[in-house]
Amino acid sequence: MFCVSKEYILTFHVSLIMKSLNKKLNKIRTNSYKSTDFIIADAKDGEMGGGAQAPGPKKGKNSSYKSYTAYLQAMREMVESRLVDVMLMSVYSAEILFHEGCFSKSPVTAAVRLNDTTDIWGLRGSNYNSFPSKNFRTASLRRVKEIADLGLYSITFSNNVEKDVESLQGLNDFQNEVAQNELSYFLEVFNPQIDIGVDVKKLPFYINDCIVRCLAGSVSADRPLFLKVQYNGPEAMEELSNYDPGRLIVGILGSGKGTTRDTFELVKQAEKYGARVALFGRKILLTESPIKTVELMRRVVQKEIGSKEAVEIYHDFLNNEKIQPYLDLEEDLIISDSSLKHGLEY
């Protein structure tokens, strides 16, 4: 007899199970998309940007944060629910859950953050977000491929020749290394966190142009499976999603927490105007019930209920479970995001 490592066995199990992400991407690529094929990712990679704040604050306390142990448990519970298609994590978290076999018999795909640019460094007392984003990568792709075959790469454009050339060279180097290690990735493109000299009305289209331009020189094998971008309103979303449908697949990021209505209205509008993926971090993490939130996100996307009704159902659930809501119903029904307000009038 010979000995087979646990890592080999887990990898073998993963290969036997069709991940929901792959099924849905195939539907989108072949123009067979239905709202049930909308992809949702839970982004729990926050410690790569916010450090010890990542697990979120303890309920009822202003300065105390949950433990990393609680953060891992939240990941396990979301994977077990099978409501998401992707769990995005730090490499360290992914390694722990991989060795537990968390994804071995699950339709949920494990993904890791493969770079940690300075614009996500939200450390207490820091001022990193006062400067243009600089490329930086902690993760070793050679190590990553042992635990996950999908990752996120992030880039932010600054309208500055030297800084953008540096960022694009980093992307090019990354693409070459991804190919060498037989990994796949999706591309995150943030809105710049500082004034870059682009008119606010033109900024969404500047970002669209940057995305298309930076990928035009890449062969299909080197391009991302999908994008993760900020929802900048219906016009920009329609333009980007209609540019190369089925090949340039657009996803949205969640940005800040906002109200519960913001969360449901965001997935509703984004899907309506062409997005096929939602990758939410704080909009899931900082809720009273993350699993119920994702369940209702799916119902909204599938047009079973509207965003207003979803908030009302959510508050009824909290009341029945005797969970104290962070906002009362009237406040939580408010749409606070300006892009979403504009989308209502579009």
List the predicted regions and their residue ranges:
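C-terminal helical cap(s) of enzyme catalytic domains, especially alpha/beta-barrels
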Residues: 271, 286-325
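Alpha/beta catalytic barrel-like cores
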Residues: 17-159, 307, 315-323, 342-346
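Active-site-proximal loop/turn and secondary-structure-junction residues that shape catalytic pockets
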Residues: 44-46, 90-95, 114-118, 157-159, ...
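Alpha/beta enzyme core
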Residues: 66-82, 101-105, 129-150, 159-184, ...
